[in-house]
Amino acid sequence: MATPQLIFVDGTFAELAQEMADFVQVGEQVQPLLEQDKREDALDLIVKASHSLNAAPEKDFTPAYNLLIHLVLQSEEPKKYLPTLCANLLKPITSSPTHGFTLASNALTTIFNLLDKSNPLRFNVFMQIVRFIRQNSQFDLLKPRLKNVEGWLQEWKSDSESQRKLYVEVSDAANDGGDQEESYFYLLKALATFDRDNQDEVASDEAQKLSLRALRMAISSPTRFDFNDLRSLPSVHALSDSHPVYSQLLDIFTEQDLEDYNDFRDEHQGWIENEKLDHEKLQRKMRLLTFASLAASTPNREIPYASIAKALQIPDEDVEMWTIDVIRSKLVEGRLSQKQKVFLVHRTTYRVFGEKQWRELGTRVDQFKTVVDRLVGVVRKAQTDVEAQREREQQELERKLANAGLGESEQRGGNRGGRTGGARQTRQRTDDDD
């Protein structure tokens, strides 16, 4: 969408309308109507003749359309004239094949921005803008504005049906623009507008048609591996009655494996081809999903190459290639041990999380608890051993200190005795002293 524009005009309605009428060559018919103050009748003639603006010289296109937009917004019923203006702008600008898209885009954006933010007419204009973007394959220009759509719909007080129409239009524009993720996202938003408590509504032809389209997009997408958001929609549940084979196929992609997919093909021979689905793409996707399930259900987090080859129905020499592919798809994280011929799982994505997964989680928690209990036991034993060793060392140290103290005491006692005896000997009188 183009940058918002302001319109600067000067003159009375009659003067400006006559100027516009002359430009689109209906001046003679409009003049008497303006003289009689029949503004709406005059404007009606001008708008009907405004298709000629698409052939106006490039330099005159924007000023002329700005003037026409100003006149229409002065009307008592802009709603009456805006569809014609928008429809004309969706047609080729013959006077400027090179810049026609930009000129028309600017005019459409000007209409949108000059309407009050809460004016419901904005909804219709925005629908035309989306269609214009789609037919010119310029979805990237629209994408930054889509973050405002939900807020706009609330401001316009759009009902569920109107919201659905807009979301489908945006989904179509994204699809034609090659943005499959955005297309799928807005298709799901469209499906969410059906009243989930109204069984007739979710089972209606429109709901089933959109649900089937979303299902086909989901299973065919090379990057989409989570189908729970789709499966949670009541209109998709209703496919089990209106399109049971498609519903069965969705169940397989949601929580089953490659073997189930192959059984499905055998049961419904030729169906995938007749429905214009690509078997090679579906089979590849099922192999990746099967790998993810295998990784999620492996208790010891080590998957032998042979188990991978069997589950994916591939030669042993292709195991490493498929492992790399599943890691790139972000379904699994881990590393290959070529020496041990195993894949070491670090992280895996659960495709669904139901009773089976809760049981698996419980088993893993029990295993983890056992490991933790063992570690705690080892740590406690080590602590006990350390404390015992420390106590033995303390006792040994005390014993040595005690022994050392005793020996020193005895030595000091012996030395004192020797000195006393010597002193006595020097004082003792002998016969030789005489």
From Swiss-Prot:
**UniProt entry keywords in alphabetical sequence:** Cytoplasm, Initiation factor, Protein biosynthesis
Q: Does the keyword Protein biosynthesis apply?
A: yes
Q: Where is the composition biased (Basic and acidic residues)?
A: 387-401
Give compartment(s): Cytoplasm
Q: Where is the PCI domain?
A: 179-350
What SMART domains would the database entry show? Answer: PINT
Report whether Protein biosynthesis shows up as a keyword of the record: yes
In terms of PROSITE patterns, this protein maps to: PCI
Q: What do we know about how this protein assembles, alone or with others?
A: Component of the eukaryotic translation initiation factor 3 (eIF-3) complex.
State the name under which the record lists this protein.
Answer: Eukaryotic translation initiation factor 3 subunit M
Species the sequence originates in? Neurospora crassa (strain ATCC 24698 / 74-OR23-1A / CBS 708.71 / DSM 1257 / FGSC 987)
Q: What is the lineage of its organism?
A: Eukaryota, Fungi, Dikarya, Ascomycota, Pezizomycotina
